[in-house]
Regions:
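Sec-dependent signal peptide recognition
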Residues: 2-8
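Alpha-helix termination/capping residues and helix-transition junctions
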Residues: 11, 52, 151-154, 190-191, ...
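Alpha-helical transmembrane segments and their juxtamembrane interfaces
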Residues: 12-13, 41, 72, 211
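A metal-dependent hydrolase metal-coordination microenvironment
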Residues: 20-149, 153-156, 162-183, 199-202, ...
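Alpha-helix boundary recognition
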Residues: 51, 129, 188-189, 238
Length: 324
């Protein structure tokens, strides 16, 4: 048990980098478009929407270009809100999208399609890293583009969109096809480290609220940071110190050498259930209420937590790997 305890603590430190430094949770969106590409609102109003609705950070990720954020400070930035540059590297292999977000690039990005879908994705990832950015794989099930087979051989990437607001993203399993959560467990069960992101992929800020539109405010992440800065947010995302949500708010997520604990922030009279999930998507424990905990056995390979609410909202906590 002592050896297991040491291994879990080492993994927690390596993946989440916890320390005694005071931290807080900050809410943000990693995928949004403006009229600089195919969004229907100008960048300053995109920034203003997220600022006004209580977000602390936003990446504007227009297609194949970096939307300059410094000039938006007067309209976007506030004491508790920052804009971070981004770009959606928009590659295709044959008819299949291979889109990769570059979060906080330091320079313009150039990338080309490869000879396979996996190579094309890797080209986008490598281009993001060369620019000093954090790569994020976007909407794998959009047009049923790529899955765990294509993702398992990728290098230098940990973020992928588990939930994308767009109607065509096929987030859930149906018709014999795996949803994004099934892809996630398939990868984790191979011992591969991937962290789940929920994002708006916002394109539509104006007009009627019709089902086919990609409106803001439906998918987001909360990152644990010691300070609100681009570097701190990107570091938290890259090491998985965040949770993804479609509406559920968490008060805290804590992992010790003995347990994985989730504390939920209640909304109205909503009821909550937490699932602790392991290898091959196996449910290890189910617990109702605002506080849920799972005691490690030592043979799980990994443990992640999923919180779902009676109003249909969900939160996804990141996996912790356990090695004997």
């Amino acid at each position: 048990m002592k050896k297991l305890t040491v291994m879990i603590l080492m993994l927690i430190t390596a993946l989440w980098g916890w320390s005694a430094q005071q931290t807080r949770w900050v809410k943000g969106n990693t995928h949004a478009h403006s009229s600089n590409s195919d969004g229907n609102e100008v960048p300053r109003r995109v920034a203003r929407w997220y600022r006004d609705y209580g977000y602390q950070f936003l990446f504007i990720t227009d297609h194949d270009m970096i939307t300059e954020t410094d000039s938006l400070d007067a309209d976007g930035n506030a004491d508790d809100f920052i804009l971070i540059p981004g770009e959606e590297i928009t590659l295709y292999f044959q008819k299949y999208p291979a889109h990769v977000n570059a979060l906080n690039p330091g320079r313009p990005i150039e990338a080309k399609a490869g000879q396979t879908l996996t190579e094309t994705l890797q080209n986008g990832i490598d281009a993001a890293r060369r620019a000093g950015a954090i790569p994020q794989l976007n909407h794998p099930n959009w047009k049923w583009s790529f899955g765990s087979e294509e993702m398992k051989d990728l290098r230098s990437v940990h973020l992928f969109e588990l939930f994308n607001v767009n109607r065509d993203s096929n987030n859930f399993s149906a018709g014999g096809r795996p949803g994004a959560e099934e892809l996630w467990d398939a990868l984790l069960s191979k011992g591969l480290v991937f962290y789940a992101v929920a994002s708006d992929d916002t394109h539509d800020y104006l007009g009627d609220f019709t089902p086919g539109k990609a409106y803001p405010g439906k998918g987001w992440v909360c990152a644990r940071v010691a300070e609100l800065s681009a570097d701190a947010v990107c570091a938290a995302l890259d090491k998985g110190d965040f949770y993804a949500s479609t509406g559920v708010e968490l008060a805290d997520v804590q992992v010790t050498d003995r347990e994985y604990r989730v504390t939920i922030k209640p909304y109205s009279d909503t009821a909550y259930t937490t699932l602790f999930i392991g290898r091959d998507g196996t449910i290890l424990k189910k617990e109702d209420g605002l506080n849920a905990a799972y005691a490690f056995r030592g043979d799980e390979l990994y443990v992640r937590a999923k919180v779902f609410a009676s109003n249909g909202e969900t939160a996804f906590c990141q996996p912790v790997f356990i090695k004997k």
